[in-house]
Amino acid sequence: MKLIIKNLKKNFEKKEVLKDINFEFEKGKIYGLLGRNGAGKTTFFNCLNEDLEIDNGEFYIEDNGKTRKIQPEDIGYVLSIPNVPEFLTGREFLKFFIEINKDKIKEIKTIDEYFDFMKIKKEDRDKLLKDYSHGMKNKMQMLVNIIASPSILLLDEPLTSFDVVVAEEMRV
């Protein structure tokens, strides 16, 4: 499987942010985007995730010689600023996420097994997400993407707010 990007272009008014991006991402490989603040890395992700309308170009998946349009379930996205339902507890959020995605999840584990995997302490599991730290919210965001197991996982500076132990484990 490959994610193919052809002639991607994005402008904000007169400022050209993405100019004729052409690239193929192969399954099983990890790619990194390097650049200064404002270079267009997050804009690139937002275009790919269809959160921003592109000015030109196309992206699609090629699998076994066949091409198809990217579907929303193909992409998981871990934002640099966590986006979680703060009115739920961590446990309620995972339970809800698993329930609405149960037909798509390949191997469902217990909620506590997921918490253990991300090193979320027992005393934090039933706290409201609004009371989680930035790093804890990021863990939850990463966890639902691990559970969903999308074909494409976009990580926008995901490890910056993780504690050192979890960040190192995620790199492995």
Question: Which ranges hold each PLM region?
Answer:
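Helix-to-loop junction immediately C-terminal to a conserved catalytic motif
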Residues: 49
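Conserved structural motif at the start of ABC-family nucleotide-binding domains
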Residues: 3-5, 18-20, 72
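Catalytic Walker B motif of ABC-type/P-loop ATPase nucleotide-binding domains
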Residues: 153-157, 162
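Conserved ABC ATPase "signature" region
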Residues: 95, 106-124
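The feature captures the beta-strand-to-loop junction immediately N-terminal to the Walker
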Residues: 31-36
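Q-loop/switch helix immediately C-terminal to the Walker
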Residues: 81, 86-102
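Conserved ABC transporter NBD signature motif
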Residues: 56-73
